Amino acid sequence: SFPGGKLDPIDADLVATALREAEEEISLMPSVVNIMGGLSPVRSPAGFIVQPIVGVIKNDIFDRLRPAPDEVACIFTLPLAHLARSDTFKWVQRQGEDHNKSYWIVAHSDHNIWGLSARVLNDLRSRLYQPQD
């Protein structure tokens, strides 16, 4: 999943929240992030409204990132060009005992990204790689 959390009273706005959470969870210093803007709000399965904020960092910043052990298992990159590939996103439908589930899976290297994170990436993909007329 992506770094994130609740708006705290100390946060000026949702961008400040995103930057604070990224610093707390993966040691990403706010000063090295170029904020590009927000994506569409997404409702989590628990009913929370999540406002994704998109930022860009330089490649050399990745080596400085450190996961907060109590919150983050690992940190990995997903090249933007990977989002444009037709085989990256898969729509999965699973039948459960009492209901069916449908969700996106983003396949990348040793990681499968799914759920809310995959929905956010799908929104980003649709904005970056819109069909040309």
Describe the role of every protein-language-model region.
Residues K6-I113, N122-D133:
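Unchanged
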Residues S117:
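NAD(P)-dependent dehydrogenases' Rossmann-like dinucleotide-binding region
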Residues F2:
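Active-site-proximal cofactor/substrate-binding loop regions of enzyme domains
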